[in-house]
A protein has these predicted regions:
Chain B
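N-terminal, post-signal-peptide region of Sec/Tat-exported proteins
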Residues: 46-80
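The canonical Cys-X-X-Cys-His
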Residues: 48-57, 84-94, 179
Length: 151, 191
């Protein structure tokens, strides 16, 4: 049975290889922090990390991520020791409705892993695929700069 | 020297005489064969399935209308997107049922292989100029016959509306053979 490594733990997954990763995370593993938005990699809502890189889990199949270390919002940090992005998100009070925010934070964390002190242009380039109906973009940008200060 | 492309199509036996505006010029058979092959294969190069990622811009295009790629997607330093928004963030190993196209090595062609904005003569010059092209003619034969990302053009899947993407105007095999003929006869470019 295929093994999916999520947030540091291996999980045996009895699903077809062409199952989207998001389905396995939410429906099989019960990790509901990763959200379904568009199902076509158009909104960024379902962003997770695969081996440290941002990945849209709604279009990546289990075959695509075979052997990869998957990180979801549940594994990014804890309440006691939040990831700098999560700490900054709380401090800036980024979220409005919150639906897209786990994807926003995972994308931001991927950016900071690549560019620890990003410019506004770096942030725009990295975050332009993460949509927010509430229009929290200016707070997202501010929070990423704040998270960079924490790192 | 100038001559219309229409007269290049016939297969010619030996040396060929072509009427031009001011004089008659005799072309060797191999040169005629090469030019005739290029005249046909370039229609594939100009097709959106190829041209959308052989852009001269800092971003790819998408669709037959060749619109700028959604979501501000950019070329990035290695032609694989920006550091945190790579092509592989969305494009996986295979075409997705949702309509997102896929290939294991999805990326933009480097600017040294940009064809966008060039006419057919310019495309040919770009392909064959050692100072600009990153591939030798022999490497072009390999690339255009066997590169899985090139061959994706003939397996482009459905778009986001569920409609089949248009394929280039000839088969992959025919295109590959024309590239072979073009290169084997000197990789000639139209004047």
């Amino acid at each position: 049975m295929p093994v999916l490594k999520v947030n540091g733990s291996p999980h045996e997954i009895d699903l077809p290889d062409d199952t989207p990763l998001l389905w396995a995370l939410r429906d099989t593993l019960g990790l509901l922090g990763t959200r379904y938005g568009c199902g076509a990699a158009l909104c960024g809502c379902c962003t997770v990390h695969a081996d440290g890189k941002a990945l849209r889990s709604c279009v990546a199949t289990l075959a695509d991520v075979a052997g990869a270390e998957i990180l979801t919002i549940e594994g990014l940090g804890t309440a006691a020791t939040p990831h700098p992005v999560q700490a900054a998100w709380l401090e800036i009070d980024v979220a409005q409705c919150g639906y897209c925010q786990s994807g926003q934070m995972m994308q931001a964390a991927a950016l900071l892993r690549e560019i620890p002190k990003p410019s506004d242009a770096d942030i725009d380039a990295a975050m332009s695929g993460n949509l927010c109906r509430c229009g929290t973009y200016s707070r997202v940008r501010a929070a990423i700069h704040r998270a960079a200060e924490f790192i | 020297m100038r001559f219309p492309s229409l007269i290049l199509a016939p297969i010619l036996a030996a040396a060929t005489t072509i009427a031009v505006t001011a004089e008659e010029v005799t072309l060797p058979q191999d040169e005629v064969a090469s030019l005739a092959a290029f005249d046909r294969l370039v229609a594939v190069i100009e097709h959106p399935r190829c041209m959308n990622c052989h852009t001269s811009t800092d971003f790819p295009r998408q669709g037959n209308a060749r619109l700028r790629h959604n979501m501000g997607v950019a070329r990035g330093p290695e032609n694989h997107g920006t550091p945190a928004l790579q092509c592989a963030t969305c494009h996986q190993d295979n075409n997705a049922p949702s309509g997102v196209p896929g290939n294991a090595n999805w990326h933009l062609a480097p600017l040294s292989m940009a064809w966008e904005g060039l006419d057919r003569r310019g495309i040919c010059r770009q392909l064959t100029d050692p100072a600009r092209s990153t591939m030798t003619p022999e490497q072009l034969v390999e690339h255009m016959n066997n590169d899985p990302l090139v061959l994706w053009a003939w397996n482009p899947g459905n778009d986001l509306n569920g409609l089949p993407r248009e394929k280039p105007p000839m088969s992959a095999g025919e295109f590959g053979e024309l590239v072979r003929v073009w290169v084997a006869n000197g990789a000639q470019c139209p004047d």
